[in-house]
């Protein structure tokens, strides 16, 4: 990508902000507006984004039209994280500052690994689609080669999601902060940097791997005698499900004297570039703890009959739960009327709900 690596090299001369203090994820909270909306003569928006590292600010200045979509990607990743963990003690809750997730991300846990991966995946997803939609000046439709297993009579063309460009740009931008760091070999700080880079890559690979051919039929009366196919991103829920499986099988790692991550337990297989890794055990997230950033589970809804993580016994960490009644309003007794609408009544139901003490 022209100019990006030179800009990143120059950015290495600058001093990075304190680890974990801020994050580009905050672009999800404060989306950057389109460049054409800036007031002429105003200070460039990139210099005002304190959550970006020096290298990321350089990329922002060069690719300002990309920033809105980086924010969208971060928002997509955060939303998916909250969906995947909604029934867990840690539910990917955010805080109202530029760290986005608070101090909990300073722990090199499985949860941190997933968050880095799904956020990086969100950027690939958003940039790839923006290319296809003609929103960015430096990319367009996908130019990926025809899949070998595509039916020989089908046409390969159309305007596909540009996953190649999305992957490359996300790698340069998201990894920039980690690449600017120069910690002592074998240090805990270096271990965390390598962990972040591994998980960022796993997230990007998930989007790349799950993208597939989509086709449209042509022919007389929809006979589908001919198809035109193109590359299309997978639904992001599929990416989230894939990364959640990687979370469940994440590898515990430690740093060695050579400055490389190695398995804590050699009986397991080495992680591939598609796997998540972590360096710290997760806190239990049961109680609010300012030092770890845990918000605790006080007041969380739980399922009285479930034996899973959403069950009251596990969610409430054995502290017990309170029961209360709530009124739910739902559509009911729906009927189709000619032509052509459905008319429903509203039904109310009193249901029991349970919250952790």
UniProtKB/Swiss-Prot annotation:
Range of residues in the leader sequence: 1-18
Database matches in InterPro entries: Wnt (IPR005817), Wnt_C (IPR043158), Wnt_CS (IPR018161)
Membrane-spanning intervals of the chain: none
Any Gene Ontology biological process: positive regulation of non-canonical Wnt signaling pathway
Pfam family, one: wnt
Keyword Cytoplasm: no
Tissue: Predominantly in neuroectodermal tissues.
A GO term from the CC aspect: extracellular space
Annotated S-S bridges: 81-92, 131-139, 141-159, 215-229, 217-224, 286-317, 302-312, 316-356, 332-347, 334-344, 339-340
Task of the protein: Ligand for members of the frizzled family of seven transmembrane receptors. Probable developmental protein. May be a signaling molecule which affects the development of discrete regions of tissues. Is likely to signal over only few cell diameters.
Gene label: WNT-5B
Glycan-linked positions: 91, 97, 289, 303
Source organism per UniProt: Ambystoma mexicanum (Axolotl)
Family membership noted in the UniProt record: Belongs to the Wnt family.
Subcellular localization: Secreted, Extracellular space, Extracellular matrix
Keywords from the UniProt entry: Developmental protein, Disulfide bond, Extracellular matrix, Glycoprotein, Lipoprotein, Secreted, Signal, Wnt signaling pathway
Molecular function in Gene Ontology: cytokine activity; frizzled binding; signaling receptor binding
Stated name of the protein: Protein Wnt-5b
Lipid-bearing positions (O-palmitoleoyl serine): 221
Origin: domain of life: Eukaryota
PTMs per UniProt: Palmitoleoylation is required for efficient binding to frizzled receptors. Depalmitoleoylation leads to Wnt signaling pathway inhibition.
